[in-house]
């Protein structure tokens, strides 16, 4: 499918697969509880784990981040360009749905330089959820063909290549700088 078709599916609160820096991600409208529940069911992922939100710039992520708890240095780190993808665990804004944060009082966000992420966010007007596109026990998909192989021929997938990152994103806590997952 092309960008316009995938953006329409996202606006209709469907789950889609799209390329990120290293692998294909499963995404949906983060403010649609029904879409997030479909995503969690598809991944067989417990709701208490929370989800990563991804966007091309901070503006898409601001509705979810408690910026009052961040200083200018932390905001700079959050928005900096890195040689590899970095996901930051940040204070969550009051009112952010629990179906996004899980059992945490924080939320994981990543500013992505992948052109597909930028285009989809621009077409939909919202950030995307991001969890690796793979069924439980199988490796993450690196091509649209692999997504179709795991999720079925008619699953909505954006035909566009993944980026050049070798591994999934590093995950760090922005307040403590604790490394949660190596990238």
Curated annotation (Swiss-Prot):
GO biological process: regulation of translational fidelity; tRNA threonylcarbamoyladenosine modification
Cited Pfam families: Sua5_yciO_yrdC (PF01300)
PROSITE patterns the UniProt entry points to: YRDC
Keyword tags: ATP-binding, Cytoplasm, Nucleotide-binding, Nucleotidyltransferase, Transferase, tRNA processing
Subcellular location field: Cytoplasm
Catalytically driven reaction(s): L-threonine + hydrogencarbonate + ATP = L-threonylcarbamoyladenylate + diphosphate + H2O
YrdC-like domain residues: 1-183
An annotated Gene Ontology molecular function: ATP binding
Membrane-spanning intervals of the chain: none
Enzyme Commission number, as recorded: 2.7.7.87
GO cellular component, one term: cytoplasm
Family statement: Belongs to the SUA5 family. TsaC subfamily.
Function as written in the Swiss-Prot or TrEMBL entry: Required for the formation of a threonylcarbamoyl group on adenosine at position 37 (t(6)A37) in tRNAs that read codons beginning with adenine. Catalyzes the conversion of L-threonine, HCO(3)(-)/CO(2) and ATP to give threonylcarbamoyl-AMP (TC-AMP) as the acyladenylate intermediate, with the release of diphosphate.
Protein name per its UniProtKB record: Threonylcarbamoyl-AMP synthase
Biological source species: Actinobacillus succinogenes (strain ATCC 55618 / DSM 22257 / CCUG 43843 / 130Z)
Gene name as annotated: tsaC
